[in-house]
């Protein structure tokens, strides 16, 4: 057991009490009342069945499924003395021995002019998000051109590609639509507030805060139940259709996005996600978990790569702190 000081214990107790006070209405809310609200105001709650082996066979006959994910890691200290590696991976269920990797390396020191020492952290995040989104979209594009799959499942909401990598995203979207390839996004960490926004308008349900969908739907759906959203949302305005799904024994839900032009396949894709997700797992399709594990860039990997291919003098002068030298 860790030896915690009393001040730290007190801070944790304070946070606990603060959060209990904030979420007391939600924790005591009648889930049946919330379900009755969701059906007419948000979308139909529907119980779905996992696909049979016979149903799954059709995906092998029609090109299989491609899973896409990305990863990033960095070595170094404060701006501009750091280096980042981005890696994207697209992997076909039919040709697992032919992974499609894409990679990008970035450091502010590579710029021709002296980098801005006071670089805004918000701008850095925008750049980082774009680099990661670009590399994932590039991997997806390469995979659909090589494998011609039935569907592509991206790890995360596909709206983020429209935001962070608009030009490449439009290329991927257009190519999928032209080739009839279904494009899907699966999100574990839901950040939307679709239900919360509608609840605040409802006079018959007293709720003091605008809770997020992740919070409101915790324990609300049964395993295999999905909510097919039929109200206007930011995702719909971006040309997407969405559903919430409880895909495992865990009481949390995930979100499934699809292009609006392919909305007739939404229920099929939600069922596919349900089928590919272990009932006792973390809620996302096993194939995405496999891709996630293979694309990850560990601390030891980035250090090994830089030690092998970067001049040792540059590595130590630019990217290794005195503290880090103890582990290099």
Predicted regions and their residues:
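Long, contiguous domain-sized segments
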Residues: 1-58, 63, 117-119, 125-151, ...
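Two-metal-ion RNase H-like nuclease active-site motif
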Residues: 63-73
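Acidic, metal-ligating active-site segments
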Residues: 73-113
């Amino acid at each position: 057991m860790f030896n915690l000081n009393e001040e730290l214990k007190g801070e944790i107790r304070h946070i606990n009490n603060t959060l209990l006070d904030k979420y007391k209405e939600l924790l005591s809310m009648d889930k049946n009342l919330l379900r009755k609200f969701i059906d007419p105001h948000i979308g139909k709650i529907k119980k779905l069945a996992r696909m049979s082996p016979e149903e799954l066979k059709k995906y092998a006959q029609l090109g299989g499924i491609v899973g896409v994910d990305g990863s990033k890691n960095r070595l170094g200290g404060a701006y501009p003395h750091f280096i980042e590696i981005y890696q994207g991976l697209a992997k076909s269920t039919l040709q697992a021995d032919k992974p499609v990797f894409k990679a990008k390396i970035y450091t502010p020191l590579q710029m021709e002019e002296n980098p801005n020492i006071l670089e805004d952290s918000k701008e850095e995040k925008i750049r980082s998000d774009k680099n990661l989104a670009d590399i994932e979209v590039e991997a997806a594009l390469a995979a659909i051109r090589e494998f011609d799959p039935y569907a592509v499942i991206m790890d995360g909401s596909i709206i983020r590609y429209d935001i962070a990598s608009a030009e490449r995203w439009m290329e991927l979207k257009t190519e999928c639509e032209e080739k009839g390839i279904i494009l899907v996004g699966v999100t574990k960490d839901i950040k939307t507030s679709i239900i919360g926004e509608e609840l605040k308008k409802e006079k018959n349900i007293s709720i003091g805060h605008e809770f997020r969908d992740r919070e409101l739907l915790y324990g609300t759906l049964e395993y295999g139940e999905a909510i097919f959203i039929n109200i206007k949302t930011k995702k719909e305005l971006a040309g997407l259709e969405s559903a919430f799904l409880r895909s495992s024994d865990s009481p949390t839900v995930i979100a499934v996005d699809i292009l609006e032009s392919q909305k007739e396949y939404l229920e099929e894709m939600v069922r596919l996600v349900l089928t590919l997700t272990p009932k006792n797992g973390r809620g996302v399709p096993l194939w995405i978990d496999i891709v996630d594990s293979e694309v990850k860039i560990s601390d030891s990997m980035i250090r090994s790569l830089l030690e092998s291919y970067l001049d040792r003098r540059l590595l130590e002068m630019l990217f290794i702190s005195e503290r880090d030298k103890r582990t290099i």
